[in-house]
Each structure stands twice: as structure tokens, then as C-alpha cells.
Amino acid sequence: MVNSSFLRIPQFEKAELLGDIDPGRHRDFDKVRSKYCTKESYLREEVYDAFKDMWDAAQADGISLTIISATRNRSYQKGIWNRKWLSFGGDESDRAERILQYSSMPGTSRHHWGTDLDLNALENSYFESGKGAEIYAWLQAHAAEFGFYQPYTRFNPYRDAGYREEKWHWSYFPTASRIQRAYRLEIDYAQLKGFMGDAYAEKLDVINNYVMGVAAWPDKAPY
């Protein structure tokens, strides 16, 4: 039986959807202990609890999971975006699309939500050989048991737009899926302003193509 609370769309403040919060002061966020991460990090409480359970299971199998990035607010994401905007040359539309291969416009990142984390390395190549391949294989086999999945897979008939594949990026589906639905209902392009090239948010339809451009929850997985 599906838990009815999972199907209900909770009320999230727009500030939470857009990343206009300080996770260190927000009631629903916990600070991640240093044993799990490489720098000061925050996650939603239920996400952190699920990650700790996954971390323990991975350790028991000889797999080490390390958070290298977790919650990022809109201001932080704006810094990432603007630096790339200034460093990339060429036509503005092309520039925006090239940045969007792997980086989100401010106000559109799943990292704003406290549900998503980057693990171990920020290169797909790391996860294609050696220890990285072992880590990725373990995550593919077991992450869903703890509520996590890879939202940015290779493009396929279901996911034919959005960011390129990110083998390091894992999302806590039970909460992220609810926030994503709330985002679709509450956010429009008038709220995605204030950064370099912001006109391309609507021109490139980033809400539908990028925020919503994620993989499906794995078949036969919990939740």
C-alpha cells in the first residue's frame, strides 16, 4: 500500500523552491558531520538520515561515499553561473546552453532544495574505472533502497532534454519529487531574474527542459 502522505503535495515556501534560504538557520535542515563530507554541508533532516543509513550500508560493503557538495542557495549558484558566463565567449544563447550542460541557472538548481548531493568526484570518468566504477555500481544497485536515485542519466526516450549525465549527482526522491511538483505549480520566469543572461531562462524554457528534465524513478524501487 502506498503511503497517502507521499502522494500529498506539501506546502513549501517559494524561498525553499528558489534557494532563497540559509540552510544553517532553516528548521528543516541539519548540518552534515565532517565524517561524511569534505566541507561544511547541510541537508534536509530526512535526507541526511537516509544518507547516513546508505553510508553505513556502503561501508559494510567496502564502499566509501563522501559528500563533496550538498545544499547550495541561490546566491551561491549565482556566483557559479556568473563566473562561467564571463569566462565563456561567443553568442549569448549558445553560451547559456553550454553552461547548462552541467550547471544550473540560479533559482533552478535541485541543490537549492536540500535533497540532492554530489558524491566523491565531479567527473563521469572517475566512475568508469577502478574504485569509482565500484562506487557507481554499488549506488546503481543499492541507492534506491534508501530513497536515492540519479536524476541526470544519459539522454533516453523518457529524458530527452536537460543537463548532461552526472554520475556523481544523487537525489532523495521522496522529498525531491514533492518539491519538484510544487516548483511546477508555484514558480514562473518572473522569479528567475537577477543574473547574467537571465533572459535566456524563458527563451530556453529551463523550467520544463531542465528543472523537470530528470530521469524517472527506477522501476520496482521503493516509494
Where are these regions (language model features)?
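Extracytoplasmic cell-surface/polysaccharide-interacting catalytic and binding patches
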Residues: M1-A70, R74-Y223
